Design a protein with these regions (language model features):
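General structural feature for long, well-ordered alpha-helical segments within catalytic domains
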Residues: 6, 10, 14, 34, ...
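Rossmann-like adenosine-cofactor binding region
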Residues: 40-123
Length: 198
């Protein structure tokens, strides 16, 4: 039984792979539309649960594998797997906290490394490998470069600042400019002063 918490890019990839190997998959997310899309795509191969419910807690505690893939861009993710959850799990259960680079979504989690990939807590294996894509540096570098290209192209034009300032989709990617912090999420999570673009 695989329970995946957070159904963004990583969560969806985990769901797909888990279904491909025949696992019983439960997806947990805060967004009902996301869960409905998954149910429409995978049908009876997936159970979907809204986050924060007793049903979600039960799915986490009864899983053989829990993947925490919670992402709130620019913010520390909420704790979605508690110490109490870990204590209630069967020994040998595996938890993978993919959100560790943003602070982790498992209570008390500490970053692991590729050479020391997990810790055991109450008989539960908890893996929170920081910079997980670093295991395949060439592939991850190519993917990152491909995804960054549109931003770099926009920086190379003469009036790049106006382009960012006036473009809804580009504006959030400009987080610091001339020493001013422009990201509300980063300002909140670090208790810093937020500035506005003028």
């Amino acid at each position: 039984k695989v329970t995946i918490i957070g159904c963004g890019e990583v969560g969806r990839a985990s769901i797909h792979q888990s279904i491909q190997i025949g696992a019983s998959v439960t997806a947990i997310d805060v967004n009902e539309n996301t869960l409905e899309d998954l149910k429409n795509k995978y049908g009876e191969n997936i159970s979907t649960i809204i986050s924060g419910t007793d049903e979600a807690v039960n799915a986490i505690r009864s899983a053989d594998l829990v993947i925490g893939a919670v992402l709130l861009p620019g913010r520390k993710p909420p704790v979605v797997v508690t110490e109490e959850d870990i204590s209630a799990m069967e020994q040998g259960t595996v938890i993978v906290d993919v959100a560790i680079d943003q602070g982790g979504c498992v209570e008390g989690v500490k970053p692991n490394t590729h050479s020391d990939p997990f810790e055991i807590r109450n008989g539960v294996i908890v893996s929170a490998i920081a910079n997980l894509p670093g295991a395949v540096p060439r592939t991850s570098s190519i993917e990152l470069s491909t995804n960054l290209q549109k931003y770099v192209d926009n920086l190379l034009i003469e009036n790049w600042f106006d382009k960012y300032k006036n473009n809804e989709s580009l504006r959030p990617s400009l987080q610091i400019h001339n020493g001013l912090l422009l990201s509300e999420e980063v300002a909140d999570s670090l208790s810093l002063t937020l500035s506005k673009l003028v």
